[in-house]
Regions:
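Short helix-onset patch at the extreme N-terminus, typifying the N->h transition
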Residues: 7-8, 37
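Binding-site signature for planar aromatic cofactors or substrates
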Residues: 24-254
């Protein structure tokens, strides 16, 4: 299937202002003063495009084989930036659902691995509920893969091994950021980075922070979606009841 070229849209950075305490940031895009810049309801409703006819008659019996194939094709597509980017959704306190984009860093031991701060908002949500979902939205290929499953921490050894492969600046950033905690100013963050940089200069071994490491999602469902003409999309879903049972592949109505 020929890739679909999406125009690059440049966005001006909205002006920022701080209150006297320097803690609260407010943004004003000017929409309220210039309502013509905003999209009308009719304009939003009119946003649609026709999908192609690159359908999928079947998939391999093993979902990981299928995923590796699709990920490889996405990575080779010049119009997809970071094919390993996935939307992670978690359920936290008061059943609050939150989503954010993280990067897939490994597919092994029957699961999908990502790394983060263990004191972050997502980590606290995972502590409360180990059911999560992942979404790989490969728009340029009219494809997506959605995954739901059980998440748990990987071993410290695995986290150490991956952390050692990260660029020095990313390693220092893991020490500098108290992820998801209130921040008085950008300068405070930069100061923490400078302090960590002085402690571990570039070229030295930076130890992994105890509060940083990996999680692995063991899937219960993996749905492969391919856009088709007339909204007659293809949906093939692998499902199992337990993380150690066999997958069953079923086609669903779009």
């Amino acid at each position: 299937m020929a890739p679909i070229l999406h125009p690059k849209v440049g966005c001006a950075r909205p002006p920022e202002s701080q209150d006297d305490a320097g803690a609260k940031v407010t943004l004003d895009t000017g929409m309220s003063q210039n309502p013509d810049q905003s999209l009308t309801r009719d304009a939003i409703r009119a946003m649609r495009r026709s999908y192609g006819d690159a359908g999928m008659e079947s998939l391999p019996a093993d979902p990981f084989t299928a995923f590796h194939q699709w990920l490889g094709e996405a990575a080779a597509n010049e119009y997809i930036v970071e094919a390993n980017a996935m939307v992670l959704s978690t359920i936290g306190g008061n059943d609050e659902i939150t989503s954010r984009t993280v990067l897939l860093k490994d597919i092994s031991e029957g699961g999908f691995t990502f790394f983060t701060n263990y004191q972050s908002r997502k980590a606290h949500a995972i502590d409360l509920n180990d059911r999560v979902s992942l979404l790989f939205p490969w728009f340029a290929m009219e494809r997506q893969v959605s995954i739901s499953g059980i998440v748990s921490k990987i071993s410290e050894k695995e986290s150490d091994e991956y952390f050692a492969t990260r660029p020095w600046s990313s390693q220092i950033g893991a020490w500098a950021s108290a992820q998801s905690q209130p921040l008085e100013s950008r300068e405070e963050l930069e100061s923490r980075f400078t302090g960590a940089s002085a402690k571990w200069p570039e070229g030295t071994v930076v130890p992994r922070p105890a509060h940083w490491g990996g999680y692995r999602v063991l899937p219960l469902t993996l749905e492969f979606w391919q856009g088709r003409y007339s909204r007659l999309h293809d949906r093939l879903r692998y499902e199992r009841e337990q993380t150690d049972s066999e997958f069953v592949l079923t086609r669903y109505y779009p």
